[in-house]
Amino acid sequence: MAKQTINQGTAPTGAGGDTFRTGSAKLQANDNELYTHLGAEADGVLTVEKTRTKLGVISDKSELTILIKDSLRQSVELASGGLQTVLYTAKGQATYMNIIQKYDMSTIDASLSGTHPAFIVDGVEKPEIFIGTYQGRIVGGELLSLPNVEPTHSTNYTNFLTAARACGNGHHLITNAEWSAVALQCFKDNKQPMGNTYYGRSSENPLLIGRRADGLNPGDTSGSARTLTGSGPVEWRHNGKENGIADLSGNVWEWNSGMRIFNGEIQVIADNNASKLAIDLGAASTEWKAINGETGNLVTPDGSGTTAGTIKYADGGTADYTINGSNFGGIRNLSTTKPVTAAALARLKALCLYPHIENTASYNGDYFAKTMTDERLPIRGGSWYNAAAAGVFALYLSNARSSTPASIGARPAFVNL
C-alpha cells in the first residue's frame, strides 16, 4: 500500500482539507502498514530482538517492546462504526465521546440556513464536535464521560465547569449550542430519545429500564433513582442505537454553558466560544450578549436585563420582542406590535430556545419553565421524576449558578481548538 498523505487544506484555517477523522484514518493506515512490515503481532506489540534490527536499534540483553496501539480507543471506534472514540485528559484518564459532524441548518429546516453555531469557534468552522457519550462523573478533579457509573450530582455549575476544563484545552462543559446541535439532529432523524423519566424506567414504556445506583427496583418511588450511565436500552440513546449518546432525556438534568437569562433577557456567548478554555463565563463577563429582536444580531446588554429592542422571555402579555410558552413546543412570539422577526427567530431556533416548528406535539410536551429575576442558567433534559415532561428539548431556566440539587448533573464535551 502506498503511503497516505493528509490533505491539510488551505492555510490558515485548513479549509478544504481532510476532517479530523479522515486524517486520523490515514495515519492509522500508515501505522498499520509499517508495523505489519516490521512483524508486529496481532495485538499491536512489536518486539525488537537483541541484535540490530530493521529499526536500526541495538539493544542490550533485554528486549525492547514498543506498544503501538491504544487498544481501548480502537475497540470503541471499531464497535461503534467510528461514531464514538476515547479521548484522554490532562491526567491521562479516558473519557468516552460521540463524534458529531458539522451540518447546515437547512438540513434541519429548509427555511433556515448556515452552519450550526456549535461548529463555529472564534469565527472558524470546525468539522466536528465531540459530545460525552455519558453523563459526567468527576474523578480526580476531572469531569469524565464513563459508562456504568452514577453521574456526579449535587454540585454547582462552577464546580462542574472547573472539572470539565481541568481535562485540558478543548475539553469543556457541554454548551447550549452543542446540546441544541444534537437535539435538532434527533428531531430530524425522528429519534427523540426516551430515558429514565420515572424512577429508573421510562414513563412512556415501563419495560425500558436502567440499573439504579441506589439498588432499588425500577419504578420504586422511594430513594434517589439515578441510573448508572448508559445502562438503559437503545431507546435511551440519541440515535436509537448502541453507538448513540446516552441519557439525554431524564436521569439528571444537565448544566449547559454559554446561555443564560438575566431578569428574563436572553443572553448568549457567541457561537460555540463557550467551549474555549480561558473564556470568561462569569456572571459579570463582558462576553455575554443579548439578541436584537429585529435583526438577530448580538448586542451588548445594559446590565439590568432591560436592553432596548432585545428578545426577552415573558410571563404573558404582548410586550415588544417577547416570547413565552407552557412547554417547549408551545413557546410562541407574543407581541402584536413588534414581534421577533424571522431573522432573529432563526438564531433562537438554532439554539433550541424557540421551536423550529410551531407545533406543540412535535416536541412530546418537553418541559419549559423559567424564573424572571436575576441570573438563571439553563439545565436541559429532565430528571428521573419528570415523566413525560423530560426530553431532549426540555429547558429549565430557574437555577442560579450556585444551585446544588441532587437532580442536576453535567456532561463533558470537546472541540479541537
Question: What do these predicted ranges mean?
Answer:
Residues 11, 32-33, 61, 135-138, ...:
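Acidic glycine-/aspartate-rich tracts in secreted/extracellular proteins
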Residues 1-63:
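Fibrous stalk/shaft segments of extracellular and virion attachment machinery
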Residues 62-79:
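Structured alpha-helical subdomains that flank or immediately precede key functional sites
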Residues 74-171, 264-322, 376, 409:
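Extracellular adhesion/carbohydrate-recognition regions
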